[in-house]
Amino acid sequence: MSSKHRICSQEEVVIPCAYDSDSESVDLELSNLEIIKKGSSSIELTDLDIPDIPGLHCEPLSHSPRHLTQQDPLSEAIVEKLIQSIQKVFNGELKGELEKLKFLGDLSSLSQALPYDETAKSFIHSHIADIVHTLNVLVQEERPHSLSSSMRQEVFVTIADLSYQDVHLLLGSEDRAELFSLTIKSIITLPSVRTLTQIQEIMPNGTCNTECLYRQTFQAFSEMLQSLVVKDPHLENLDTIIKLPLRFQRLGHLVALMALLCGDPQEKVAEEAAEGIHSLLHITLRLKYITHDKKDQQNLKRALTKCREFLELHSSAAKCFYNCPFRIAQVFEGFLDSNELCQFIMTTFDTLKTLKHPCIQRSAGELLLTLAKNTESQFEKVPEIMGVICAQLSIISQPRVRQQIINTVSLFISRPKYTDIVLSFLLCHPVPYNRHLAEVWRMLSVELPSTTWILWRLLRKLQKCHNEPAQEKMAYVAVAVSP
């Protein structure tokens, strides 16, 4: 697909994607996890350990790389005209879609002159940074969940055209790597072709065939990737392409939000959230597999086994999340690291401030308690969590939810490595004037051995406090702890 072939046609092309349909809804193929049960002693974690998704198998792409259409050499006048047009963009800004498309077309046309025209070659190589910056802007300006024009396709075509002439815009520097990441994000964030078609039916623009544009865009993206290694097939370039360019920076935050929405009082919202969290589970499994530390293989295998055993109990994995947020915590707990667990807790508490519907609050309480019970030993930011609990307990009105949160505090305080941290936060709040913290003291529920340990640590802290200067003492006068 050279610049000469930039018009959408009805030609069938293969894309690395599939339609989403009710008959082919994503579901964990649990049989693929049998390798874990049968070979648990194996040291290496293989790709077979990761569940596959029926319905999303890709047909192989064409093995024939795209070649630019042979054209007559460009005259010096045309080359100069193209350079002036491109330079004008660098000196100004692209305002309309036609102007943007013209800029991309000019770049592709000029790329064809690189093998024989020194002026074109010198201009392109001296303006790599400008080209990368402009393409970055064009990709960023595209709506992430929409495909209403051929702009993405044109960007991919232009990058490929230059790559075939040994001008690589996605490799070799930080800004080029950023452009590479943006192009991949622009594809990943696209909804399914069915969703895009439905949007077009509701808001027709009459400019293009959505399905054709969707397929052409994916084909252009595929050929752009191929172009990166066709001319320079070195292993380091392959590694750059294969290496995962995206990672969830706030996975715990995302899981918590989706989990809370699974308990939304509006049935439609809860159902869509359940489907979304199911898809997120598949993405998380794949990400964790690709990025996991070799030293942590056994932990990942255990998490996969637990996930498999849990989902075997439910005929539909997506439906098992609907109105049952605590199950989400059970499934995801093994795939969240300590930072992500903290994000999960913080997001759940933050949501309690803005979403005060009883259903949401109940979901939040169940999520917190379930996660704390199963992963309490993995938390590394207990001080931050306790700070949030002490500050926000007053906004939680439902007795059941308050009790669940207090039970979470009980779990933390009963673990020796967290006892002093929890006591410090509770003692630093003036109990006689804070009925919410007084309730925490009264409702703490721990086993007898833990009670003895906690009381001993509490007495030690009280003694230490009385031995310190007055200005350094904690802000409390007395603490009454019911037996």
Curated annotation (Swiss-Prot):
Pfam name, any one: HEAT_Maestro
InterPro entries named in the record: ARM-type_fold (IPR016024), HEAT_MROH2B-like (IPR055408), Maestro-like_HEAT (IPR048465), Maestro_heat-like_prot (IPR045206)
Coiled coil: none
Designated name of the protein: Protein MROH8
